[in-house]
């Protein structure tokens, strides 16, 4: 019986279908807890008396040694039967194997033992006055008094024990047999052709367990070292031959490891890791060349464990995932369009793991771990491992803790601006070296395309390679869950945990899920393979899993090579640059704002630049994963809650306003309106029309995660904003209808929230503000009620302290000051709105240091002073609203100072809307239109009309060391520049999400 609560990702219909499918194939009958699980042997000797922290290297170590004694003897016999271990090295070989065997069993025994000792102790069955004494008593008496009860409590553990024992003895015997079968080849790898016997000095197993517990192994002979791989080494052999033949044809030289090939296994020469400077230009250039070759061969999984740094360059040692199959087909399921953004991303260099590759959890502020070969600055690892707290006691605790809390690198405080600039300079230099090598090899492939394709055909046609269908990390998590006391005590839990693979993706084939479950029940990481010239995905024993490749990996790779060109190269370079430099933004357009607030240039040049940006956006759009999905882009993805440690990972852009597809579509709609290019309108419609169809049909939702659904910039309010803008610029009333329908849905939901969350970007208050400011809901009373409850919370002090410490507009108080002032007279209680604004203004005064308002931004530094999101421009917007709608509370001197500060500091940083010059100018344009006599009004008009010439913008957009040039984001990227330029060229009304007010100034 499956447990519903363990599969929360599935809806009720999906869960019932899974239950039915499992029943139809009698899957649970295969999980027998008794028939194939003989009782664990009970040694006759007592448990040794040496127990406790001074006698044992780990908790229960002595108990394990006693329990597994008979199995240890079998390992000794297997080693003794080998022809390759002499008397001198016998203890070392046996010791290494026994350690590995113990670890495999302990992975499943340790947590149940900790739980059981606690249970036995709570029942008063242990003797001793201290927790340490009771632990010793438990271990000594375990065979006689507690062993039977232990296995009764955890019946699945007998099965697990039997599997591990059977697997381990089989793979040890198999290893020695394979050494003997390939001895001549191993001698060739070692250069040991004399008659001296091969003598094995040490043996170290390492890696994940696949296909019956098999794992890689490092074999140190007296003649040298080789690596054993218990799977096909076709990929390694083909890569070696390709590298040799490319060098003969004049390609950049690379080093590859030699292999000896057996049937579904092989041995590889050992590549010694060298101490290499990862900032050295020569090393980076050679790594870039290797990366371009991997890109051509669709090579993946090239992370730090799979390449070895040497003075000659990086040497790959794990090549089972070249010719990676991206275009997979589920039996009976709809095909993904060839032009889909998903497939385009999967083939990109960003997925190779050779670049800095930072993995984060759902909350990026918790840190990251960089697994890339060319790693960047390392952070606090947010992922968790298992530790035993209070070991050698009866009250020991098994706890999951972050790896960073186990002594790994700590995030600490964010570095100062000077340190960030130094790191930025280092990363820019590293990126340039890497890019230089990547461009060289990429262009060499393009210039010798026919020869490259012929080489791939001749060397790769019959390869057997690995098909990576799911990240190994996800499978590893399930294996750990199978070792929990809960899983080992219940067949239902054990079965359901393995069946969580059904929730990994939508529409997974039943055959695939069953194959994964069978592997997991054997305690293996599921492993799948494919032949390069065929379309089937198979298990290690050749069973097809209801999943195929559309054309074969070979044809997919050849087709990929045929489409390599300068436009594609530019996209890959964006991905490379972002991987290196995105955590280190360039925030200086000019030292003095006066240098860029003049010399606008001609309108023709502006239109040419706008056309160039829009052409690029229209050319790089891709279809969704289904014909009815909105079209989108693949690019580095900026975060609306950016932290220094957060890299802009390349991905398929979602339908969000901040950095996603709908913001880009809005900019293209504006460009179509001003420039008159039909192609831009068609591209915008490709994004907007499917969304409008979904909204107006009422049959489906937009499938946004619930936690972001009502966020102004990441959720449905932002989509409604862009649809309304699209309606305005494209003349399409259907888009307006969809915007209002979606806005009404948002309004109805947030109206039910008793204590709305503050913050413009992501709070309920921000959603209400955007809906009101741009008339996105017909029921205005709903968002007004949200503002009223927000006012009540402010007056009562019911809002989190962190919010009170932020003065800015994006996440702080300024947006609330703006909204409560702007709509104070429309709210249920104008006086309450006034009182709340007065409270916020008093708090804002406390953050005023006389020069600017302390921002207290999440990243802990004042990088955005003067701009909209966290700086003076946002404060100016708020104070201008107070001046217009609650004049009795206005502080004109503060407003004037905020405008001056914004003009001085906020117009010289970068070209973004969120925290750069263009957003600052939009804000100041709104302010001076509503407060015409504000300080520096003429300078603002002059900057908007005459500043930011085309050559400056073009130079910045062409500079790939500036992260904002790498993304088409509306808020922090190239489509934001397009929007600003076309609005200025067309002299159209201000329509921007950073100013939540579309009404004309009074």
Predicted regions and their residues:
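C-terminal catalytic region of ATP-dependent kinase domains
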Residues: 1-135, 139-176, 313-611
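Low-complexity, Ser/Thr/Pro/Gly-enriched N-terminal "stalk/linker" regions
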Residues: 578-654, 659, 670, 674, ...
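Conserved ATP-binding subdomain of kinase catalytic cores across diverse folds
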Residues: 75-82, 86, 90-299, 304, ...
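CBM-like carbohydrate-recognition segments
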Residues: 912-915, 927-1002
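Solvent-exposed loop and edge beta-strand segments that line ligand/cofactor-binding
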Residues: 643-661, 700-716, 751-764, 799-814, ...
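Well-ordered alpha-helical scaffold segments within catalytic/enzyme domains
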Residues: 355, 594-600, 662-677, 718-732, ...
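Long, well-ordered core segments of solenoidal/helical folds
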Residues: 612-629, 682-702, 734-754, 785-803, ...
């Amino acid at each position: 019986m499956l447990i519903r609560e363990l599969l929360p990702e599935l809806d009720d219909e999906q869960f019932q279908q899974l239950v039915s499918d499992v029943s139809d194939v009698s899957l649970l009958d295969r999980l027998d807890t008794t028939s194939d699980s003989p009782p664990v042997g009970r040694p006759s000797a007592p448990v040794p008396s040496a127990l406790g922290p001074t006698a044992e290297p780990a908790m229960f170590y002595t108990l394990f040694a006693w329990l597994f004694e008979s199995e240890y003897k079998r390992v000794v016999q297997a080693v003794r039967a080998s022809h390759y271990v002499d008397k001198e090295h016998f203890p070392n070989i046996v010791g290494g194997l026994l350690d590995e065997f113990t670890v495999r069993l302990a992975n499943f025994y340790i947590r149940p033992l900790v739980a059981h000792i606690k249970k036995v102790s709570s029942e008063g069955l242990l003797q001793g006055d201290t927790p340490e004494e009771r632990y010793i008593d438990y271990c000594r008496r375990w065979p006689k008094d507690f062993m039977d009860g232990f296995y009764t409590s955890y019946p699945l553990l007998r099965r697990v024990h039997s599997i591990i024992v059977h697997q381990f003895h089989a793979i040890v015997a198999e290893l020695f047999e394979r050494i003997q079968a390939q001895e001549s080849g191993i001698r060739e790898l070692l250069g040991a052709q004399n008659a001296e016997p091969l003598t094995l000095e040490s043996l170290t197993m390492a890696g994940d367990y696949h296909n019956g517990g098999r794992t890689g192994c490092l074999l140190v002979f007296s003649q040298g070292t080789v690596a054993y791989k218990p799977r096909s080494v076709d990929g390694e052999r083909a890569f070696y031959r390709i590298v040799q033949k490319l060098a003969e044809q004049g390609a950049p030289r690379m080093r590859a490891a030699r292999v000896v090939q057996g049937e579904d296994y092989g041995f590889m020469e050992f590549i010694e890791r060298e101490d290499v400077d990862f900032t050295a230009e020569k090393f980076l250039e050679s790594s870039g060349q290797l990366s371009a070759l991997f890109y051509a061969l669709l090579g993946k999984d090239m992370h730090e464990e799979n390449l070895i740094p040497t003075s000659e360059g990086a040497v790959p040692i794990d090549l089972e995932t070249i010719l990676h199959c991206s275009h997979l087909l589920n039996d009976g399921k709809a095909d993904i369009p060839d032009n889909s953004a998903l497939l385009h991303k999967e083939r990109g260099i960003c997925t190779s793991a050779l670049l800095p590759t930072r993995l984060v959890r759902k909350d990026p502020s918790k840190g990251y771990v960089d697994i890339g070969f060319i790693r960047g600055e390392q952070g606090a690892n947010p992922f968790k491992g298992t530790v035993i707290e209070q070991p050698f006691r009866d009250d020991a605790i098994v706890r999951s803790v972050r790896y960073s809390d186990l002594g790994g690198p700590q995030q600490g405080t964010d570095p100062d601006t000077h340190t960030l600039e130094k790191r930025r300079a280092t990363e820019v230099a590293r990126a340039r070296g890497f890019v230089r090598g990547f461009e060289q090899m990429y262009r060499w492939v393009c210039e010798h395309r026919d020869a490259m394709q012929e080489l791939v055909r001749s060397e790769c046609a019959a390869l057997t390679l690995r098909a990576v269908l799911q990240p190994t990390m996800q499978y590893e998590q399930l294996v750990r869950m199978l070792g929990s006391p809960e899983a080992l005590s219940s067949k239902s839990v054990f079965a359901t945990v393995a069946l969580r693979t059904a929730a990994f993706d939508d529409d997974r084939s039943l055959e695939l899920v069953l194959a994964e479950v069978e592997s997991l029940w054997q305690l293996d990481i599921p492993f799948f393979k494919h032949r390069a010239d065929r379309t089937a995905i198979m298990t290690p024993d050749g069973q097809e899993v209801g999943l195929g490749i559309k054309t074969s990996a070979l044809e997919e790779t050849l087709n990929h090579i045929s489409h390599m060109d300068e436009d594609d190269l530019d996209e890959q370079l964006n991905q490379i640059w972002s991987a290196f430099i995105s955590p280190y933004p360039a925030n200086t357009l000019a030292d003095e704002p006066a240098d860029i607030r003049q010399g606008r240039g001609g309108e023709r040049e502006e239109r040419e630049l706008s056309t160039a940006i829009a052409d690029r956006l229209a050319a790089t759009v891709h279809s969704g994963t289904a014909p009815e999905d909105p079209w989108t882009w693949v690019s580095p993805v900026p975060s609306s809650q950016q932290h220094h440690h957060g890299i802009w990972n390349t991905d398929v852009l979602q339908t969000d306003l901040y950095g996603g597809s709908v913001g880009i579509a809005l900019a293209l709609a504006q460009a179509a309106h001003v420039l008159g290019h039909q192609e831009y309108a068609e591209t915008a419609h490709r994004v907007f029309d499917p969304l409008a169809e979904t909204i107006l049909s009422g049959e489906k939702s937009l499938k946004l995660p619930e936690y972001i659904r009502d966020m102004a910039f990441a959720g449905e309010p932002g989509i409604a904003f862009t649809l309304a803008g699209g309606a305005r610029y494209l003349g399409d009333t259907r888009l307006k209808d969809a915007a209002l329908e979606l806005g009404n849905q948002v309004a109805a939901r947030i109206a039910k929230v008793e204590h709305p969350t503050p913050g413009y970007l992501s709070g309920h208050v921000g959603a209400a503000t955007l809906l009101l400011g741009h008339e996105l809901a017909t029921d205005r009373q709903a968002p007004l009620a949200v503002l009223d409850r927000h006012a009540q919370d402010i007056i009562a002090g019911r809002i989190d302290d962190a919010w009170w410490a932020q003065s800015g507009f994006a996440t702080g108080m300024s947006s609330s000051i703006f909204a409560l002032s702007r709509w104070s007279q429309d709210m249920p209680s104008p006086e309450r709105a006034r009182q709340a604004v007065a409270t916020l203004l008093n708090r804002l005064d406390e953050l005023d240091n006389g020069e600017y308002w302390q921002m207290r931004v999440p990243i802990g530094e004042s990088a955005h002073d003067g701009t909209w999101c966290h700086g003076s421009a946002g404060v100016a917007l708020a104070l201008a609203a107070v001046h217009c709608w609650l004049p009795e509370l206005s502080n004109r001197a503060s407003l004037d100072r905020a405008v001056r500060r914004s003009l001085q500091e906020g117009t010289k940083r970068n070209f973004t809307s969120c925290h750069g010059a263009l957003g600052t100018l939009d804000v100041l344009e709104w302010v001076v239109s509503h407060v015409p006599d504000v300080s520096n009004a003429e300078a603002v008009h002059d900057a908007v009309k005459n500043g930011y010439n085309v050559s400056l913008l073009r130079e910045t957009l062409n500079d790939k060391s500036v992260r904002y040039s790498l993304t088409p984001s509306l808020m922090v990227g190239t489509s934001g520049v397009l929007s600003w330029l076309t609005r200025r060229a067309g002299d159209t009304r201000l329509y921007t999400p950073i100013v939540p007010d579309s009404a004309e100034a009074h």
